[in-house]
C-alpha cells in the first residue's frame, strides 16, 4: 500500500441511495456565473437563481461531496436535490433557517 492510496471496492458506488429526491428547474437571472457546492442548503442559494425555494428547503444537490454545479448567466437547467440527513438542523448560509428544518 502507498500512503494516501485509495483502494475502492469493486462495483458501482451509488450516491445518496434511497434518498427521496426532487428535480427542480433553476435559472440564473443574474449577469455573473453562480456556483453552488454539494452540501450548500439549496433553498438559501444566491438570490439571482430563480427556482421553487419552498421545495428546496432542507435540500442539497445530489452530487458527489466536494463538487459543485455552475449556472452561467441566463442559463436554465434541472437539478436533482436530496434532503439533508442527520439531525436536519441548518445554521449559517444566508441565515434564513438557523435551526431545525
UniProtKB/Swiss-Prot annotation:
Gene3D superfamilies: Urease, beta subunit (2.10.150.10). Its EC number is 3.5.1.5. Its main location: cytoplasm. Signal peptide: none annotated. It comes from the Bacteria. InterPro entries: Urease_beta-like (IPR002019), Urease_betasu_sf (IPR036461), Urease_subunit (IPR050069). Keywords: Cytoplasm, Hydrolase. It is an enzyme of class 3 (hydrolase). The keyword Cytoplasm applies. GO terms for cellular component: urease complex. Pathway: Nitrogen metabolism; urea degradation; CO(2) and NH(3) from urea (urease route): step 1/1. One of its GO terms (biological process) is urea catabolic process. Pfam families: Urease_beta (PF00699). GO terms for molecular function: urease activity. The keyword Phosphoprotein does not apply. It is found in: Cytoplasm. It catalyses: urea + 2 H2O + H(+) = hydrogencarbonate + 2 NH4(+). Belongs to the urease beta subunit family. Heterotrimer of UreA (gamma), UreB (beta) and UreC (alpha) subunits. Three heterotrimers associate to form the active enzyme. This is Urease subunit beta. It comes from Jannaschia sp. (strain CCS1). The lineage of its organism: Bacteria, Pseudomonadati, Pseudomonadota, Alphaproteobacteria, Rhodobacterales.
